[in-house]
């Protein structure tokens, strides 16, 4: 495990994440992975709202091999109805949980860098790649939790 240098933000240790070039990731896959992460990690509702909005911001094309999104906190406030402080808290909680990783600019803002033709060549923001990379782990944990709930239900019914 290594620590990624994000500029100014303290980040949790993460394993390098590489997306295969032929991977055709769409929002449906990301929404499914987010749903599994919410269940597996028992994330609070505010985390779920913000994570859903972040996945909804994904444009369908990786930027530099990463699934980057760059919505502002103000945008997330408007879409979720949460305060800016709550948005900051939730984003840091998602980063600490390893659901997201950050690619920070020098000033900490999220934005895309476009070519003269208007194509996105790079971006700074939040990376959804860990969400997709850990999808199998989340699915396994959800299965274990379901089995445990079923076992408890059967014990209670007896």
Q: Could you say what each language-model-derived stretch is?
A:
Residues 1-68:
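Short recognition helix of helix-turn-helix/winged-helix DNA-binding domains
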Residues 60, 65-81, 94:
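A short alpha-helical element within helix-turn-helix/winged-helix DNA-binding domains
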Residues 90:
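Residues in the recognition helix of alpha-helical DNA-binding motifs
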Residues 96-105:
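A short, conserved structural fragment
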Residues 105-114:
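Short, Lys/Arg-rich nucleic-acid/phosphate-binding segment
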Residues 132-158:
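Extended alpha-helical scaffolds
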